[in-house]
């Protein structure tokens, strides 16, 4: 059915818009030199970038093959690992400083939104491989709500800093 397929396209567009907006806000927060909690925004920016790359089919764009190679599949995983590894290593080295910050974040509204978003993404992924008539719509709906929660978390972060 063309209308169902078109409706699903609208869901994809909304997902990408929410992810892109969330990514831009989290990058903006990460670039704020005076915030003590910017490390959380850096990790969140990398995660949002990875989710955004997963949501868009980079192969469908008129980009060089090397961009497709690093923006999808194993290349994407390697790229994100290379981006995330130094940040996590830095956090491990500065464990005392960041342990309390991470704990406070997960006990805040931001953390609640991130945990709920993760849970909804897991639930949505369960429908990805099920053979239901509207399984894709169910999966994408869960993802859209999850991305809305990610946006909520980033928006809350942009409004106030959590200090240790």
Residue ranges of predicted features:
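Membrane-interface helix-boundary motifs at transmembrane edges
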Residues: 28-40, 97-108
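Membrane-interface interhelical loops and short amphipathic "cap" helices
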Residues: 6, 60-71, 131-139
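C-terminal ends of transmembrane alpha-helices
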Residues: 51-64, 118-133
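Hydrophobic cores of alpha-helical transmembrane segments in multi-pass inner/ER membrane proteins
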Residues: 15-28, 79-94, 143-160
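Single conserved hydrophobic/aromatic residue that forms the stacking wall/gate
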Residues: 1-12
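Membrane-helix boundary/juxtamembrane motif in polytopic membrane proteins
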Residues: 95-118, 138
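Terminal transmembrane helical module of multi-pass membrane proteins
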Residues: 100-103, 120-160
């Amino acid at each position: 059915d063309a209308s169902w397929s078109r409706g699903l396209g609208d869901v994809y567009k909304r997902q990408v818009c929410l992810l892109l907006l969330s990514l831009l806000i989290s990058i903006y927060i990460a670039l704020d030199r005076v915030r003590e909690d910017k490390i959380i925004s850096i990790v969140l920016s990398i995660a949002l970038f990875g989710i955004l790359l997963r949501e868009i089919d980079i192969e469908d764009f008129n980009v060089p093959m090397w961009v497709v190679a690093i923006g999808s599949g194993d290349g994407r995983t390697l790229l994100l690992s290379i981006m995330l590894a130094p940040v996590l290593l830095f956090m491990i080295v500065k464990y005392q400083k960041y342990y309390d910050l991470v704990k406070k974040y997960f006990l805040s509204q931001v953390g609640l939104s991130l945990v709920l978003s993760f849970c909804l993404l897991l639930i949505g992924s369960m429908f990805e491989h099920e053979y239901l008539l509207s399984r894709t719509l169910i999966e994408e709906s869960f993802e859209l709500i999850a991305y809305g929660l990610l946006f909520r978390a980033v928006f809350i972060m942009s409004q106030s800093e959590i200090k240790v």
